[in-house]
Amino acid sequence: EKYNLGLLGIIPSIGEVKTHKLLNFLKLVDEKKMQGGVRRRLITRENPKSPVSESYRSLRTNMLYSSSEKEVRSILVSSAGPGEGKTTTVANLAITYANLGKRTLLVDTDLRRPVVHKVFDLEREPGVTNYLSGQTSDYQSLVKKCEIDNLSIITSGIIPPNPSELLGSKRMMNLVKQLENDW
């Protein structure tokens, strides 16, 4: 109320996910990848009928219809500190958009503690920092496919010594504009 912002959704805590038959059935994650809580981040893929998955779909729908004038082309998820659910939120939101048949691109701009590549079992490099630091001028060479239809990912790339400067650069603004036009 203080900032006159509307509420688009509330995502409950995922908690522990049962691993026995569900993961074997989906064949999404093998035993090695389940360590470290990575498996539970993709709740919309692992357990699409759960209340948490429904909350992500509700959030997606509310975001789709929150602007009647113009289609939302990009979404930024941030928080004040680590471990607050940014990666889990963006991964599940991206899956819900892709499940609608929308061509979806998830860009990991957590340049300090990137995890998106682990969640989707992808190589971290090359990624967005390779583009921002001028190592490549073709962002399309960074786009990686994953197991989920309609979902592509640009991983973070190398961990730079100057993440704030890279994210605030003109090259980053140009990348966002290009991505909004192309995706």
Task: Identify the residue ranges that each predicted region occupies.
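Short, intrinsically disordered, charge-balanced linker/junction segments flanking boundaries
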Residues: 1, 145, 177-183
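Short boundary/hinge segments that flank catalytic cores
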Residues: 1-103, 109-115, 122-125, 160-173, ...
